[in-house]
């Protein structure tokens, strides 16, 4: 009988040991996005727990945040008794802005068994001023030179008025066109990491060395363009190569520049298609290089002959 009890106890210990070893934490997210993320305030983090045992549940977690540039841990949540695993706030961390961080997490199950630490993920807390420092808005033509009418009144019966028709007829046709913007740069050292910050209005498609970056078709998100605009951050470390590199950005009108054609509900424009861009390349030797949008960029017309958020698109066959 004692032998049976010993055997059962041993099997239970082995069972818990296997479970502890097999509990893993994956799919780390920051603001519900995987991969490198840039935010402007305290992050909200998420993860998934995986176990081969049915019914395994999280009862606690611990988060550790490291400042990459300082090379040290700057915050640890300690063991927090909670089943929460999504949108977990780090407001208590009081993390500094304009810094780059990595983070990892471990969890405990219902038997109070801890998992191993997850693989690290990363995020940056940057103000938009820091993200686009030194860059300029660029495009084929400025709003002033394009003679674009001001205001949001051009819809419905207002569009039929002679003065409205005359105002829109006077707009320079260059302000309606889709354009390509291009900038070349040279890399002579081994790249540690590279990050690009892109705001292309109304919509943009970003490519590096001829390959599209990201999978968005309508970036950035729409906004009240006279109040705020959104931008995207990309980890382009794997796409920057030694030697010559070329940045390409295709711009379209989107809701930023609705000038009508084929079909319309309204006409409103905040300006011709425009770009603000900054890329930071960090090298293994500790130096870095920054490429920003400015007067040294080149532009040309794209194969898109017509584009309107309501009227669709006409392209030139290659």
Regions found by a protein language model. Give the residues of each.
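Predominantly extracellular/luminal regions of secreted and cell-surface proteins
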Residues: 123-137, 143-158
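Pro/Thr/Ser/Gly-rich low-complexity, intrinsically disordered linker/stalk tracts
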Residues: 21-53, 122-130
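Bacterial N-terminal signal peptides that target proteins for export
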Residues: 1-7
């Amino acid at each position: 009988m004692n032998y049976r009890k010993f055997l059962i106890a041993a099997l239970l210990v082995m069972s818990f040991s296997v479970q502890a070893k097999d509990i893993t934490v994956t799919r780390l997210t920051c603001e519900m996005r995987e991969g490198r993320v840039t935010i402007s305030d305290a992050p909200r983090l998420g993860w998934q727990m995986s176990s081969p045992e049915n019914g395994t549940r999280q009862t606690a977690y611990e988060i550790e945040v490291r400042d990459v540039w300082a090379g040290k841990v700057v915050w640890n949540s300690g063991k927090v008794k909670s089943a929460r695993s999504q949108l977990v706030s780090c407001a208590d961390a009081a993390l500094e802005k304009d810094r780059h961080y990595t983070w990892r997490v471990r969890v405990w199950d219902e038997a109070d068994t801890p998992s191993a630490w997850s693989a690290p993920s990363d995020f940056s807390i940057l103000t938009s001023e820091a993200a686009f420092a030194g860059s300029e808005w660029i495009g084929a033509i400025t709003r002033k030179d394009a003679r674009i009418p001001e205001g949001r009144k051009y819809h419905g019966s207002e569009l039929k008025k002679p003065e409205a028709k005359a105002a829109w007829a006077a707009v320079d046709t260059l302000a309606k066109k889709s354009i390509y913007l291009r900038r070349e740069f040279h890399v002579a050292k081994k790249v540690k990491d590279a990050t690009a910050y892109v705001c292309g209005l109304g919509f943009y498609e970003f490519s590096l060395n001829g390959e599209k970056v990201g999978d968005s078709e309508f970036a950035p998100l729409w906004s009240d363009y006279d109040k705020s605009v959104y931008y995207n951050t990309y980890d382009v470390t794997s796409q920057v190569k030694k030697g010559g590199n070329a940045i390409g950005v295709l711009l379209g009108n989107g809701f930023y520049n609705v000038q009508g054609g084929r079909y319309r509900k309204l006409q409103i424009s905040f300006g011709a298609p425009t770009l603000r861009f900054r890329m930071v390349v960090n090298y293994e030797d500790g130096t870095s290089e920054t490429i920003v949008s400015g007067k040294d960029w080149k532009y040309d017309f794209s194969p898109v002959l017509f584009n309107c958020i309501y009227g669709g698109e006409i392209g030139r066959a290659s």
